Amino acid sequence: MLRWIRRLFMGLCGLVLAIAIAGVTWQWLATRRDIAATPPPGRLVDVGGYRLHLWCTGDGAPAVILDAGLGGTSTGWGFVQPEVARFTRVCSYDRAGMGYSDHGPSPRTARRIASELAELLARSGIPGPVVLVGESIAGFNVRVFASDHPERAAGLVLVDASHEDDAHDVPGMARFVPLLSTIGLFRLLGVSFGQRVESLAPSVRRYAQATRFRAAGYQAAADELLHIEETVSEVRNTRRTLAIPVLVVTGARGADEHWRRLQQDEASLSERGCLITAQQSGHVIPIDQPKVVVDAIRTVVEIARGQEAAPCATSQQTGQVVR
C-alpha cells in the first residue's frame, strides 16, 4: 500500500514537472514569436549589460521623458506623446523588464530606476535638463531623479502620482508572480499588468499586444511592488524643496479628500508648484484625459524655455486649477 502511494506521488510530481517544463517552453517560444512579429518602435540602448527601450519623437528642447505607472510601458503614452511631439522632443521608455526592455537587476527601487534613466539619457545623447513626467508609482522615480540629478531636471509633471504617506500593502500574490509568469500561466489565462490593449491609442496597440505577456514584465512589476518600502525610504530622503516647476495632475473620479491632500503636498515640493484636477478622469489620466497632461507638460516646457507661462494655467474645458 505504501509502495503504491509512493508511486502515485512520484507520478503526480512527474506530471507536474512535465506540465511546468511544457509551460516554460511555450512561454519562451510565444514571447520570441510575438517580439519577432512586432519589433520595437524605438531603439534599444545598452545601459551597462542590459538594454532599455527608448522611443523618441519630435524636435526641440527641453526634451520630455515619459515614465509609466506600475506594469505600464511606453505604449501607455500613445495619446500624449504625439501631441507633445508637436512642440518639443519627447521620449517614452520602458523600465527594465517592461515592454521591449531587457530584464534588469533587483531590487527595482526608485533610486535604481532613476540611475538607469540617467545612464539611458547620457548614452542616448540627451544630457538635459529634461522635463520628467511620472505616472502613478513612477512619480517616485522622477522625484528621486530630480533630487539626485538636479542639474539634469528642468521640471516635473506628476500624474496622479503615488505618495510616500499613502498605504503600501503588497499583495501576497506578488511573491508568486515570477514563477507563474515563467510557466506561462498568465499568458494562458490572458492576465496582464497595465492597461487593457483596447483602451490604448490605436497607433500603439500592436506594440502592447506583442509585449503584454512577457515574463520579464510581470517579474519587474512584482519586484517594484515587493521593494516598495525601500523606494518609500529613498523618496523620504530626497529634497523636500525643488527649484524647478512641479505640476501635479490628479483625477477627480474616485479620489477622496485624503488622496487630494497628498496630491497637494506633492505640489508643495516647489514654490512654482500647483495642483491641476482632471475632472473627467480616474487614475489613468493619460488615457482618460490626455489633453490635461499635454497642457501641463506644455506649461513646464515653456517655463524651461524662459517664456512667459503661468505655472498653473490650464483650459477651463480640461481641468481645474488649485493654486
Segment roles from a protein language model:
Residues P202-T277:
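Conserved serine/cysteine hydrolase catalytic core
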Residues V45-V47, L54, I65, V84, ...:
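Generic structural signal for small/hydrophobic residues in well-ordered secondary structure
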Residues P127-V170:
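Conserved hydrolase catalytic core segment
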Residues L158-G194:
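A catalytic-pocket lid/entrance helix-loop region that shapes and gates access to the active site
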Residues M1-P62, R86-T88, E302-R323:
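Alpha/beta-hydrolase fold catalytic core
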Residues E271-R323:
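Catalytic active-site module of serine/aspartate enzymes centered on a nucleophile-bearing elbow/loop
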Residues Y50-Y100:
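Conserved HGGG/HGGXW glycine-rich cap/lid loop of the alpha/beta-hydrolase fold
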Residues W55-T57, R95-V133:
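Active-site loop/oxyanion-hole signature of alpha/beta-hydrolase fold enzymes
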